[in-house]
A protein has these predicted regions:
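Active-site charged/polar residues at nucleotide-handling catalytic sites that mediate phosphoryl
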Residues: 14-16, 174-175
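Conserved pre-ATP/AMP-binding loop-to-beta segment of ANL
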Residues: 62-80, 87, 117, 121-130
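Conserved AMP-binding A3 loop
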Residues: 76-105, 112
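Gly/Ser/Thr-rich phosphate-binding loop
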Residues: 83, 152, 177-182, 192-234
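Conserved AMP-binding/adenylation subdomain of ANL enzymes
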Residues: 99-130, 138-178, 193
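Conserved AMP-binding
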Residues: 1, 134-139
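ANL superfamily adenylate-forming
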Residues: 25-72, 99, 194
Length: 234
């Protein structure tokens, strides 16, 4: 979360959240606010914070979670808007709408495998899929298209702290990243960084997806010219 303490306080209160999961930076921002909410601390000392327990303790084997009947139309998550004109607004999504994401991506993958390039090549699903998550997990792209889809398919995730195209192509080469999804400007950044750093091997990257804005035609042409075997999603 990029929220500061006041915004975290608002979101927790507005959503009527029952537990807060955060790292050292987020827990520091929340100190002195909504002290009654239980906190699960990640990668930090739980004893340093109010009403906090370590993540490692929470996930220790214990009693099985109770089975809960879930209807496809039940509420599943609340994503908050940017709040550019006031307090952020909570956008509720259902289980059905979230599950539709991996279903849609599976359909797109199946369609892609049946297409041929001008050179007669066909798209082959990588044996060891790996995705570069360079967008926030509090956004549907990071949460659903990156995290959830990877959870369903067993895809490895490489996380970036913040966007840096030069660092991105370094990670793509190092971890043999096979897919990337972000806004079109990020895809353009990758293409430009790869041109400026030709020593980087990006041959593992076979899918360059994106959304949030229309992909410029010149970007598609540049990708087809420089990386003809890679799929450009819109």
């Amino acid at each position: 979360s990029w929220w500061q303490g006041k915004e975290l306080d608002y979101g927790i209160t507005h959503s009527e959240a029952k537990v807060f999961i955060g790292d050292d930076e987020r827990l520091q921002r929340l100190e002195g606010l909504v002290e009654d909410i239980p906190r699960i601390s990640v990668r930090c000392d739980a004893s340093a914070y109010t009403n906090s327990v370590a993540f490692e303790e929470v996930v220790e084997p214990n009693e099985a979670f109770p089975l809960v009947e879930i209807d496809p139309e039940d509420d599943a998550s609340i994503m908050y808007t940017s709040g550019s004109t006031g307090y952020p607004k909570g956008v509720v999504t259902t289980h059905r709408s979230i599950i539709n994401t991996p279903v849609a991506w599976a359909f797109l993958g199946s369609m892609a495998s049946q297409l041929e390039t001008d050179g007669g090549e066909t798209f082959v699903q990588p044996e060891s899929p790996c995705t570069l998550a360079a967008v926030p997990l509090f956004h549907v792209t990071g949460s659903h298209s990156n995290f959830l889809l990877s959870l369903v398919t067993g895809t490895r995730i490489v996380l970036m702290y913040k966007w840096d195209p030069v660092k991105a192509i370094e990670l793509i080469e190092k971890y043999k990243v096979t897919s990337f999804s972000g806004v079109p400007t990020m895809a353009q950044d990758i293409l430009k960084a790869s041109e400026d750093n030709p020593e980087r091997d990006l041959s593992s990257l076979v899918s360059l997806g994106g959304g949030g804005a229309a992909r410029p035609p010149e970007q598609i042409k540049a990708q087809e010219k420089n990386h003809p075997s890679k799929i450009a999603g819109v």
